[in-house]
Amino acid sequence: MADVEESTAPAEIQSRHVVYCGVCSLPPEYCEYGGTVKKCQEWLEKKYPSMYERLWSEDALAAATSTLSVDAQKRAAKDATKKAAKAEALEAKQNETLASSKIRIKRVERNKRKYVTEVQGLEAFGLELKKVAKEFGSRFATGSSVTKVASGGQEITVQGDVSDDVREFLIKNYKNIPKKNIVLEEPKKKKAEPVEV
């Protein structure tokens, strides 16, 4: 047994570190297929400049399109401008929707002297309703739940008359919600009808 066989043990498998985009949560190589290419590029340039140079520099883009025919290059340029225009229009529409969205905080009488506070419109600002309901419950030491509304949306119902406190809590903890978009709706009191004697 002069020949000693060296057992080739497989090398230890190394895990790869994959960078995910902070905007669209895809790897940066796939950001071009999402709808937020501009934002993704800005994020990548700020966080990982070397990767940005590798993917989006003029040289990298020229190298990627150099293998295409002239017609294909024209189509690619046309598609890129179309996608950019579509993304800008979508972003403008989202900004307009956010600007016009209102958060309605209503105090509703449950029975005689008991009230609940209803909060509608939080989902327009990208907030997770269950998480916010849990924060309300712990902050105000009351029951808080997400309920479905007849119109098809959802609202947060908080036990007790805490409408002013909810407004202050939202302004303080969620800076992305403009103060003017939070509306307190007071229920109109019914006028007592005159009693005929």
Swiss-Prot record:
**InterPro entries for this protein:** DENR/SUI1_TIF (IPR050318), DENR_C (IPR046447), DENR_eukaryotes (IPR005873), DENR_N (IPR048517), SUI1 (IPR001950), SUI1_dom_sf (IPR036877)
State the disulfide connectivity: none
Q: Which PROSITE patterns match?
A: SUI1
Q: Name one GO biological process term.
A: ribosome disassembly
Cellular compartments annotated: Cytoplasm
Keywords from the named record = Cytoplasm, Ribonucleoprotein, Ribosomal protein
Mind listing the GO molecular function terms for this protein?
mRNA binding; translation initiation factor activity
Q: Does the keyword Transferase apply?
A: no
Q: Provide the primary localization.
A: cytoplasm
Extract the CDD domains matched here.
DENR_C (cd11607)
Q: Which Pfam families match?
A: DENR_N, SUI1
Tell me the leader sequence span.
Answer: none
What region holds the SUI1 domain?
Answer: 103-174
Quote the cellular component terms of the Gene Ontology held in the record: cytoplasm; ribonucleoprotein complex; ribosome
Q: What is known of its domains?
A: The SUI1 domain may be involved in RNA binding.
What family does the Swiss-Prot or TrEMBL record give for this protein?
Answer: Belongs to the DENR family.
Q: How does it assemble?
A: Interacts with the 40S ribosomal subunit.
Q: What is this protein called?
A: Translation machinery-associated protein 22
Q: Which organism is it from?
A: Botryotinia fuckeliana (strain B05.10) (Noble rot fungus)
Q: Mind giving the lineage of the organism this protein is from?
A: Eukaryota, Fungi, Dikarya, Ascomycota, Pezizomycotina
